């Protein structure tokens, strides 16, 4: 038998073995997968990511979701929980509240040690869910409805995952994806002396953890790959989970189609990696932000699907974890992690290069113009005197724009941050609370791998944007260049070295089965939040119209590939977020228009868009579009709108709605 034939036979045997049902009692783990809606306010709330005062929500393209994975070791009953969210960041406020809720509902089961929360870093979701002022500047303060929707949804996703615990097996695989990201700060990257293998500026590694049930069926997967979720530009006003959210949607909705299947596309060291392959907003590979979102998402899906379908390495062994809060203010760093000299971190400050934004993904302006920002004015302004000389020296090459760590009565950026590590058999997963550049993450990954090999660790996955958010982390060499990422590295030139020290120490603790010390406590600032974004006083319909009336009816007929556009008199979307529901339905009533109505699309589907606009002082218009996708059954359809309106006199919020006349889908264009 030839070598190629033998290899093919061996691969076939492996795949057959993986797909064969196994006795539940023989399986090493139980796992549960769950998903819940975390979509915030869909109108008149600043979006989180681009820091633009002008970018406010005005509808929904697709909803935001939390995807939870609960893993339980069969032998010990020990559990780990990983949640990936379609959010710009996991802010510490969210982490603290979620953990408080879990501890209250499941005492002794879930705590900071075994729950990791992560974000995809979409820039097209409503903001205002941080307790630190720096991240609420362009949103005009704290947005309680959005915050509660996020917390409630994350908790609900974990509850659903726990309710679905089943025996199963885990498999790890990896591969390279080289056409879905590009380094937006290549000159800074090239200053690193250790870029062998990374000369083109990207980290191509994708890691996939597959969840296989007792029948040998794939129940879900987590894919880690570094690329910013900025395919949608700062000109977009529709809520969107961006490219990673589309990858999840495509696998779950278009490919698997199995109830309960959950696919998460998580981040790693994406700090300087853009999906805009032409290095300008909304460009690359196409010149349309929606096409780019789908294409970059499809490329991530295709690689993850390929890896999950290959013969993978089975994950076997114990579950373990470590977690600690660390005060980053003046944290000492040992010489082996620096330039051979003892160093320390600085009080947090942002640099002038941050104000320009990232021109490749979307420039600022951060909402820093005090005359245009009542929230900033109420905080006392951006600059409060000349920064102390000690801070200027500590921050080295950075020209300080604002010393955010010295703001009173509370700092504008975190001082205490979470560091976390999971052990899942021979895999270690690191949870880091910031955006790490390619080499900042690679250095930590390599160092942890070296520290963990003696414990049988074969794979290290680095997950940024986890448990909290403290802007960027660059290498020492990149920091000196003071591009956007360097100006956004809060704690000074040795920030990456500090994280590397903390993760190596934690890896050693896991290896030696030692506890880690938490000497700091993350402050709860929920008492002290402000909001200058106006709410809903009341809703009025158009003169001579009623809520739910159709302002624009569909044509009599369309063909597949056409776009149907209709409009309704509606209320303000802030009245009801319609969590786990929808603002629209596309309904199929059959070829004769008389069959039982069947919903074929909602506001979570790629082919629909729900756009809201204010008309006059208190009226609202909802414009709904449906791009008829290939595979749509010919027949009669109508579009229904759901909304809510607030009465001025009683302040009561009531559900409203309306439906268009029916229209016919004829098939493809001749």
Swiss-Prot record:
Signal sequence interval, chain numbering: 1-24
Entry superkingdom: Bacteria
Regulation: Inhibited by EDTA, EGTA and D/L-sphinganine D-erythro-sphingosine. L-erythro-sphingosine is a less powerful inhibitor. Stimulated by glycerophospholipids: cardiolipin is the most effective, followed by phosphatidic acid, phosphatidylethanolamine and phosphatidylglycerol, whereas phosphatidylcholine, lysophosphatidic acid and diacylglycerol are less effective.
Reaction catalyzed: an N-acylsphing-4-enine + H2O = sphing-4-enine + a fatty acid
Keywords on record: Disulfide bond, Hydrolase, Lipid metabolism, Magnesium, Metal-binding, Secreted, Signal, Zinc
Consequence when changing residue 121 to A: No ceramidase activity
Entry keyword annotation includes Transcription: no
Residues covered by region (Required for correct folding and localization): 644-670
Residue sites binding substrate per the record: 84, 92, 111, 130, 469
Note: Alternate N-termini have been proposed by different authors. It either starts from Asp-25 or from Leu-27.
GO cellular component: extracellular region; membrane
Protein name as annotated: Neutral ceramidase
Disulfide bond residue pairs: 346-394
Record flagged with keyword Disulfide bond: yes
Comment on bound cofactor: Binds 1 zinc ion per subunit.
BP GO terms, sorted: ceramide catabolic process; long-chain fatty acid biosynthetic process; sphingosine biosynthetic process; sphingosine catabolic process
Database matches in InterPro entries: Ceramidase_alk, NCDase_C_sf, NEUT/ALK_ceramidase_C, NEUT/ALK_ceramidase_N
UniProt record similarity statement: Belongs to the neutral ceramidase family.
Active-site residues, Swiss-Prot/TrEMBL: 274
Quaternary structure and partners: Homodimer.
Organism: Pseudomonas aeruginosa (strain ATCC 15692 / DSM 22644 / CIP 104116 / JCM 14847 / LMG 12228 / 1C / PRS 101 / PAO1)
GO function term, MF aspect, one: metal ion binding
Cofactor dependence: Zn(2+); Mg(2+)
Function: Catalyzes the cleavage of the N-acyl linkage of the ceramides (Cers) to yield sphingosine (Sph) and free fatty acid at an optimal pH of 8-9. Also catalyzes the synthesis of Cers from Sph and fatty acid.
Compartments in which it is found: Secreted
This enzyme's EC code(s): 3.5.1.23
pH dependence per the UniProt record: Optimum pH is 7.5-9.5.
